[in-house]
Regions:
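Hydrophobic anchor residue at the start of the ABC signature
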Residues: 117, 129, 145
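Walker B catalytic motif
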Residues: 103, 132-133
Length: 185
């Protein structure tokens, strides 16, 4: 169980299924047994925008390379006019106005990851799943992204489940850390 506004970290060696677990929690894959519930409702019953959003480790794989980034942002759950929230998130994520006219291949990994995070922070997002989202970035960009993301999730009571190989990072950003190890039997 992940409580509203809680920050949970997940650590495990490579190949232990951390990304698969997040895919199940996001509804991209079905579990072999059991079910994922959001406020008591099975996740597969949600239609349209699902309040569980995933931010992938490789942002270039989560966007359509043929779409301008303004369209990528518009895929998020925003009020019709874009709203104050979207503007605030874009500012917190350091998204420059001129980037919106570009295509994904025209941005760096860090710049593109900022778009992916902003898109995931739609107005109805309740749980954010973060899969090694800053592993490929320099330390300054990592700090900027995590600072903005934690500020936004805290102010809106959004739960965060973060996967990382960095114990130090998870200790700084999470209230609880789950260590996955080999399961026998």
């Amino acid at each position: 169980t992940v409580e509203s506004g809680e920050r949970v970290g997940i650590m495990a060696p490579s190949g232990f299924g951390k990304t698969t677990l997040l895919k199940i929690l996001a509804g991209y894959e079905r579990p072999e047994s059991g079910e994922v519930l959001l406020d008591g409702t099975p996740l597969e019953r949600f239609r349209g925008y699902v309040p569980v959003q995933m931010i992938w480790q490789h942002p270039e794989l989560s966007v359509n390379p043929a779409r301008r980034l303004k369209t990528v942002l518009a895929e998020g759950d925003w009020p019709e006019d874009g709203g104050v929230m979207r503007g605030r998130i874009e500012k917190e994520m350091w998204i420059l106005e001129e980037w919106k006219e570009r295509y994904p291949a025209e941005l760096s990994g860090g710049e593109l990851q900022r778009f992916s995070i902003a898109r995931a922070l739609g107005q109805r997002t309740e749980i954010l799943l973060a899969d090694e989202i800053t592993a490929m970035l320099d330390l300054i960009t990592q700090r900027q992204i995590w600072s903005a993301l934690l500020k936004e999730t805290q102010s809106r009571g959004i739960s965060l489940v973060a996967v990382s190989h960095s114990q130090e990072l998870l200790e700084k950003i999470c209230s609880r850390i789950l260590h996955i190890s080999a399961i026998s039997g």
